[in-house]
Amino acid sequence: MLPSFLSARTGPVVLPRVAGVAALAMGLLGFLASCSKDDETTAATPSKITVPQRALSPEGIQYDETNKRFIVSSRTQGRIGTVRDDSTYTQLADDPRLVSTIGLNLDASRQRLLAAVSDIGVNTTRSTATTLRKLAALAIFNPSSGALTSYVDLGALRPALPHFANDIAVDAQGNAYITDSLSPIIYKVDAAGVATVFLENSQLSGGTGFGLNGIVYHPDGYLLTAKTSDGTLYKVPLATPTAFAAVTSSQSLVGADGLLLLDNNTLLVVAGSQNTVFRMASTDAWTTTRSSGSFATGAVSATTITRRNGSDAFVLYPYTATSPRFAITKVVF
């Protein structure tokens, strides 16, 4: 199509020099503005990204604002990869010790990507009798190169217990807190890589099911963590973890998985077995909470959720362990 400042007539058009230049400039501005609008439309954030990766079964997700990409884990293959808005998947990191990568935490200010490593038997290539339901580890990577910089064995702290390292929170000092879904434990790995048992209490047990799952750090100095089996949400003070308490809630959070602290008073909870993302609100520093909204995911085995562009939230749909695809979907309440 011809720009509007060019005539479609067959004969020559003679314009005064000044008028001609002005018309040319106006036409170019209009043309460039049109291009700019097209570019903005192209760059718009998609509401859903479907990724054609067979049997990847991603469990954890983070959004890398600096590089404009999602980072996902894999229960069935162990490797960590990135996803662009055009659905392109690229492997970022892998190591033979990564039987199943579960929760992720992108600690951007310290240039670290933290991954919880476990073995529940779904990676048939790497699972062994010595790791099955016994492996709990924290792997730390350079998020730019994918290089593994540290691997911390957490299960060795309680070798007689079953283990499943699940999710990770990082506090303001760089300490990492990792939930164990098969034992009633929260581990702590300090910035120097030293691992300890931060909290161990039978109340945190999931019995024959999954116990603690999602975990987030609250800037007022405590952790919020959810138990999958019964949906209990716990508040755990960093200074006195044994003084942890259940958060009183009128909303059932049974099946609670990933958490996202959207702001100090708003927590998003992915309840996979309920096919729902709940928006929970608190006005008393998480002594109590109530639901202020929900988002229906459908039967997609939703696991966890991440922040993008400050306030947007995207939930991960792994579907099944053998699915030919997975999806990342914007949550709208």
Where are the language model's segments positioned?
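Bacterial Sec-dependent N-terminal signal peptides
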Residues: 2-5, 25-51
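A short beta-strand motif characteristic of beta-propeller blades
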Residues: 45-52, 88-94, 147-158, 195-207, ...
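Beta-rich, blade/repeat-based domains predominating
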Residues: 53-67, 75, 96-121, 155-176, ...
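Short loop/turn segments immediately following the C-termini of beta-strands
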Residues: 75, 118-120, 181-183, 228-229, ...
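Structural signal for beta-propeller blades
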Residues: 78-80, 122-123, 138, 184-187, ...
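Short loop/turn segments that connect beta-strands within beta-propeller blades
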Residues: 83-88, 142-147, 189-194, 237-242, ...
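Short, conserved, GDST-rich strand-edge loop motifs in beta-rich repeat architectures
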Residues: 116-133, 318-326
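Asp-box/WD-like beta-propeller blade repeats and closely related beta-sheet repeat scaffolds
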Residues: 129-173
